[in-house]
Amino acid sequence: IINYYFKLSHMSKEGSLGAPIRHPIDFEHPDFLNPEKLDAEMRRVFDICHGCRRCFNLCDSFPKLFDMIDESKNEDVESLSSDQFAPVVDACTLCDMCFMTKCPYVPPHDFDLDFPHLMLRYRTAQKKLGKLPSVPTQLAQIDRNAKIGVMFSKIVNWASNIKNKLIRKVLELITGIDKRVQLPKYNSETFSNFFKKNKDKINYQTPSKDRKVVIYSTCFVNFNKKNTGVAALKVLKKNGVEVQEAYPGCCGMPFLEQADLPKVVEQAK
């Protein structure tokens, strides 16, 4: 009996029953971009996903993958050519829903599946070969683009309005952004600039007068939704809270989506 329970306690644990274990991306390892090993890992993971399909109702990556397999000659991953993997990867938004909530084979399971990280690995290989489109890479330069957007906010907001059908059609042809998508408007000034002019006038006649808060404005509040930060600032000042503002720069998520991992590390620092 003791031996039986010992074996049970050492069996592979199913993932997603507890918090999944996420391993760091070792993008500097020589095998990370090895074409043969990457292709083998793609096929291994796709085959496991094909046999499970628990993630069928998440992002479009999985329906694309399963449809391709079902329509292949032998209805298996081996019937797919490596060139067919790209649409599956392109549909992944790196939202992590599969890894965090659905997949039963994430670490600590022996299958060690991390679908988003694998998609990122494939994109990194595509980037090295020059197969990623250049426009999304430029759109990922959030701080540069947003500073221009704020500087010329009236013109940019007018041009990006969905009612401006001609310019939105041209924008769609150039960038691939659907003309029906409502794009965020730019502030007439950054929240950081607004804060510098309005950080004083704190109400010190309150029980909260000795408290301090830092507002991390994020790129969206700093460049697009200033009123969110303004509202928070007003509430905090009225309650006597001393406020500081910080916007060190874009978090780097757009660079992650474009597989620019060194730039992501740089932004994190």
What are these regions (language model features)?
Residues 40-46, 75-250, 254-269:
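Iron-sulfur-cluster electron-transfer modules
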